[in-house]
Amino acid sequence: MADKTGTLWYVMGPSGAGKDSLLAYARQRLPGGVMFAHRYITRPADAGGENHVALSREEFDAREAGGCFALVWRRHGLAYGLGVETELWLGQGMDVVVNGSRSSLPLAMARFPTLRPLWITASPEVLAVRLRQRARECGEVIERRLAEAASFAPPAGCEVLVNDGALAQAGDTLLRWLRGGRRVC
Protein backbone atom coordinates (compact mmCIF):
# COMPACT_ATOMS: atom_id res chain seq x y z
CA MET A 1 0.00 0.00 0.00
CA ALA A 2 1.30 3.45 -0.89
CA ASP A 3 1.91 6.16 1.68
CA LYS A 4 0.00 8.64 -0.46
CA THR A 5 -3.16 8.30 -2.50
CA GLY A 6 -2.73 9.34 -6.11
CA THR A 7 -4.52 12.26 -7.72
CA LEU A 8 -7.48 11.66 -10.03
CA TRP A 9 -7.30 14.21 -12.86
CA TYR A 10 -10.88 14.51 -14.09
CA VAL A 11 -10.82 15.98 -17.60
CA MET A 12 -14.11 17.31 -18.91
CA GLY A 13 -15.54 19.69 -21.45
CA PRO A 14 -17.89 19.87 -24.41
CA SER A 15 -17.91 17.55 -27.40
CA GLY A 16 -15.43 18.82 -29.97
CA ALA A 17 -13.12 20.52 -27.45
CA GLY A 18 -10.31 18.13 -28.37
CA LYS A 19 -10.19 16.17 -25.12
CA ASP A 20 -9.31 12.87 -26.84
CA SER A 21 -6.48 14.49 -28.83
CA LEU A 22 -5.10 16.25 -25.75
CA LEU A 23 -5.25 13.09 -23.65
CA ALA A 24 -3.44 11.13 -26.37
CA TYR A 25 -0.81 13.90 -26.56
CA ALA A 26 -0.25 13.77 -22.79
CA ARG A 27 -0.27 9.98 -22.66
CA GLN A 28 2.61 9.78 -25.14
CA ARG A 29 4.71 12.20 -23.09
CA LEU A 30 4.09 11.27 -19.45
CA PRO A 31 5.97 8.60 -17.48
CA GLY A 32 4.48 5.23 -16.57
CA GLY A 33 3.57 6.42 -13.07
CA VAL A 34 0.59 8.28 -14.53
CA MET A 35 -2.23 5.98 -15.57
CA PHE A 36 -4.77 6.86 -18.26
CA ALA A 37 -8.00 5.06 -17.50
CA HIS A 38 -9.93 3.58 -20.41
CA ARG A 39 -13.64 4.18 -20.31
CA TYR A 40 -16.05 1.29 -20.78
CA ILE A 41 -18.68 2.51 -23.26
CA THR A 42 -21.71 1.05 -25.02
CA ARG A 43 -20.30 2.37 -28.30
CA PRO A 44 -18.69 0.24 -31.05
CA ALA A 45 -14.89 0.08 -30.93
CA ASP A 46 -14.65 1.45 -34.48
CA ALA A 47 -16.87 4.49 -33.82
CA GLY A 48 -13.87 6.83 -33.77
CA GLY A 49 -12.57 9.04 -31.02
CA GLU A 50 -10.96 7.68 -27.90
CA ASN A 51 -9.51 4.25 -27.35
CA HIS A 52 -12.21 2.67 -25.17
CA VAL A 53 -13.49 -0.73 -24.12
CA ALA A 54 -16.58 -1.36 -26.23
CA LEU A 55 -19.40 -3.24 -24.49
CA SER A 56 -22.89 -4.24 -25.49
CA ARG A 57 -25.68 -2.81 -23.34
CA GLU A 58 -26.21 -6.23 -21.78
CA GLU A 59 -22.52 -6.69 -20.93
CA PHE A 60 -22.33 -3.17 -19.49
CA ASP A 61 -25.39 -3.80 -17.32
CA ALA A 62 -23.95 -7.12 -16.10
CA ARG A 63 -20.63 -5.48 -15.19
CA GLU A 64 -22.42 -2.65 -13.42
CA ALA A 65 -24.52 -5.14 -11.43
CA GLY A 66 -21.34 -7.06 -10.60
CA GLY A 67 -19.61 -4.02 -9.11
CA CYS A 68 -16.99 -3.72 -11.86
CA PHE A 69 -17.29 0.07 -12.12
CA ALA A 70 -16.15 2.78 -9.72
CA LEU A 71 -18.30 5.35 -11.53
CA VAL A 72 -21.11 5.12 -14.10
CA TRP A 73 -22.98 7.75 -16.10
CA ARG A 74 -25.25 7.88 -19.12
CA ARG A 75 -25.10 10.59 -21.79
CA HIS A 76 -26.24 10.91 -25.38
CA GLY A 77 -27.84 7.46 -25.38
CA LEU A 78 -24.65 5.70 -24.23
CA ALA A 79 -23.52 4.21 -20.93
CA TYR A 80 -20.03 5.05 -19.63
CA GLY A 81 -18.07 3.45 -16.82
CA LEU A 82 -14.74 3.84 -15.05
CA GLY A 83 -13.42 0.50 -13.91
CA VAL A 84 -12.61 -0.31 -10.30
CA GLU A 85 -8.95 -0.54 -11.36
CA THR A 86 -9.00 3.26 -11.09
CA GLU A 87 -9.35 2.94 -7.31
CA LEU A 88 -6.58 0.33 -7.18
CA TRP A 89 -4.16 2.63 -9.04
CA LEU A 90 -5.02 5.60 -6.82
CA GLY A 91 -4.54 3.45 -3.72
CA GLN A 92 -1.07 2.52 -4.96
CA GLY A 93 -0.16 6.21 -5.13
CA MET A 94 -0.44 6.52 -8.91
CA ASP A 95 -1.99 9.56 -10.52
CA VAL A 96 -4.86 8.68 -12.84
CA VAL A 97 -6.21 10.73 -15.75
CA VAL A 98 -9.81 10.14 -16.82
CA ASN A 99 -12.07 11.60 -19.47
CA GLY A 100 -15.08 12.43 -17.33
CA SER A 101 -18.52 13.91 -17.79
CA ARG A 102 -19.41 17.46 -16.78
CA SER A 103 -22.77 16.37 -15.46
CA SER A 104 -21.21 13.58 -13.36
CA LEU A 105 -18.60 15.76 -11.64
CA PRO A 106 -20.50 15.90 -8.30
CA LEU A 107 -20.73 12.08 -8.24
CA ALA A 108 -17.04 11.76 -9.09
CA MET A 109 -16.04 14.28 -6.42
CA ALA A 110 -17.96 12.30 -3.81
CA ARG A 111 -16.32 9.04 -4.90
CA PHE A 112 -12.73 10.28 -5.34
CA PRO A 113 -11.51 12.67 -2.60
CA THR A 114 -8.27 13.43 -4.49
CA LEU A 115 -10.12 14.51 -7.65
CA ARG A 116 -8.87 17.60 -9.46
CA PRO A 117 -11.14 18.77 -12.28
CA LEU A 118 -9.65 20.08 -15.51
CA TRP A 119 -11.93 22.01 -17.88
CA ILE A 120 -11.10 21.85 -21.60
CA THR A 121 -13.11 23.86 -24.08
CA ALA A 122 -12.90 25.68 -27.40
CA SER A 123 -14.69 28.62 -28.95
CA PRO A 124 -18.18 27.90 -30.36
CA GLU A 125 -16.83 28.30 -33.90
CA VAL A 126 -14.06 25.76 -33.36
CA LEU A 127 -16.44 23.33 -31.64
CA ALA A 128 -18.80 23.51 -34.62
CA VAL A 129 -16.02 22.86 -37.14
CA ARG A 130 -14.63 19.92 -35.17
CA LEU A 131 -18.03 18.30 -34.64
CA ARG A 132 -18.76 18.50 -38.36
CA GLN A 133 -15.30 17.17 -39.28
CA ARG A 134 -15.52 14.10 -37.07
CA ALA A 135 -18.76 13.11 -38.85
CA ARG A 136 -20.15 11.07 -35.94
CA GLU A 137 -23.34 13.12 -35.60
CA CYS A 138 -25.91 14.61 -37.96
CA GLY A 139 -26.60 18.36 -38.17
CA GLU A 140 -29.44 18.32 -35.63
CA VAL A 141 -27.32 16.46 -33.06
CA ILE A 142 -24.41 18.84 -33.64
CA GLU A 143 -26.68 21.82 -32.98
CA ARG A 144 -27.89 20.19 -29.74
CA ARG A 145 -24.29 19.56 -28.66
CA LEU A 146 -23.35 23.18 -29.38
CA ALA A 147 -26.34 24.44 -27.38
CA GLU A 148 -25.40 22.11 -24.53
CA ALA A 149 -21.80 23.36 -24.61
CA ALA A 150 -23.04 26.93 -24.24
CA SER A 151 -25.20 25.95 -21.25
CA PHE A 152 -22.36 24.45 -19.18
CA ALA A 153 -19.88 26.56 -17.26
CA PRO A 154 -16.69 25.42 -15.57
CA PRO A 155 -16.92 24.70 -11.85
CA ALA A 156 -16.37 27.77 -9.68
CA GLY A 157 -12.71 28.75 -9.53
CA CYS A 158 -11.61 26.16 -12.08
CA GLU A 159 -8.93 27.08 -14.59
CA VAL A 160 -9.96 26.63 -18.19
CA LEU A 161 -7.81 25.33 -21.03
CA VAL A 162 -9.07 26.83 -24.29
CA ASN A 163 -8.02 24.51 -27.10
CA ASP A 164 -8.51 26.70 -30.17
CA GLY A 165 -4.97 26.57 -31.56
CA ALA A 166 -2.25 24.05 -32.24
CA LEU A 167 -2.47 20.75 -30.38
CA ALA A 168 1.06 21.17 -28.99
CA GLN A 169 0.17 24.51 -27.42
CA ALA A 170 -2.79 23.22 -25.41
CA GLY A 171 -1.09 19.83 -24.94
CA ASP A 172 1.95 21.40 -23.31
CA THR A 173 -0.29 23.36 -20.95
CA LEU A 174 -2.07 20.14 -19.98
CA LEU A 175 1.30 18.45 -19.41
CA ARG A 176 2.41 21.26 -17.09
CA TRP A 177 -0.76 20.82 -15.03
CA LEU A 178 -0.38 17.04 -14.82
CA ARG A 179 3.36 17.11 -14.10
CA GLY A 180 3.15 19.92 -11.60
CA GLY A 181 0.46 18.30 -9.50
CA ARG A 182 -0.73 21.78 -8.68
CA ARG A 183 -4.31 22.46 -7.79
CA VAL A 184 -6.06 24.04 -10.75
CA CYS A 185 -9.47 24.53 -9.14
Swiss-Prot record:
Q: Could you tell me which InterPro entries the record lists for this protein?
A: GK/Ca_channel_bsu, P-loop_NTPase, PhnN
A Gene Ontology molecular function term for this protein is: ribose 1,5-bisphosphate phosphokinase activity
Q: What reaction does this enzyme carry out catalytically?
A: alpha-D-ribose 1,5-bisphosphate + ATP = 5-phospho-alpha-D-ribose 1-diphosphate + ADP
Entry keywords, A to Z = ATP-binding, Nucleotide-binding, Transferase
> Which GO BP terms apply?
5-phosphoribose 1-diphosphate biosynthetic process; organic phosphonate metabolic process
Pathway given for this chain reads: Metabolic intermediate biosynthesis; 5-phospho-alpha-D-ribose 1-diphosphate biosynthesis; 5-phospho-alpha-D-ribose 1-diphosphate from D-ribose 5-phosphate (route II): step 3/3
EC number(s) stated in the UniProt entry for this protein: 2.7.4.23
Q: What class of enzyme is it?
A: transferase
Task: Give binding positions for ATP.
Answer: 13-20
Described by its record, this protein's role is as follows: Catalyzes the phosphorylation of ribose 1,5-bisphosphate to 5-phospho-D-ribosyl alpha-1-diphosphate (PRPP).
Which family would the database say this protein is a member of? Belongs to the ribose 1,5-bisphosphokinase family.
What is this protein's name? Ribose 1,5-bisphosphate phosphokinase PhnN
- Can you name the source organism? Chromobacterium violaceum (strain ATCC 12472 / DSM 30191 / JCM 1249 / CCUG 213 / NBRC 12614 / NCIMB 9131 / NCTC 9757 / MK)
